[in-house]
Amino acid sequence: MAEDKKPLSRSEREAKIKDKAGWVITVIAALLAVNTYISNGNSSKVLNNTIKANDTWAFYQAKSIKQTLAEQSLDDAIARKDTAKAEKMKAKIERYESDPATGEGKKELMAKARALEAERDQVRKSGPWMTFSGMAYQLGIVLLSAAILAVSMPLFWGSIAVSAVGALLMSQGIWLWLPI
């Protein structure tokens, strides 16, 4: 004769959920911590690259002003037929335009500033994904806490599903595998 399974009491169900939830909440919290760490690093990189790019553009503008002044001096030297000064100014103007030896010509500065901006823009793309991921992890933790209090397996599985979405969003934030 088959024994009828008695339904679990509330305290037995609560113990069962607490056993599972303890491990799950630890994993979700660890993922949330990693997500926050990466997000903060990305925020710092965006800020640093913005500052560096702005500094480089300011240096570029200073070189442009100096080049304009050198061009005016060149015109004056040509008008006064001072060939020595004219040659000196031509060399200076060429160095302001491009100076590969020091990397401080306008051409090199523009390339450096654009590279910094491109890196900043690439890192900035991950920001929303990491934010949404963090929100999903937090919601997963809240649902898991509610599952423990309500002794509800559907809430438990719902928290796992929401956290899985958080992991998917975090992977998009890290690798940008979807071209959105």
For each of these PLM feature ranges, what is it?
Residues 10-21, 122-130:
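Short, Lys/Arg-rich cytosolic juxtamembrane segment immediately N-terminal
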Residues 7, 13-16, 20, 138-180:
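Juxtamembrane interface at the cytosolic side of transmembrane helices
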Residues 111-134, 143-148:
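Short, aromatic-rich amphipathic segments at membrane interfaces
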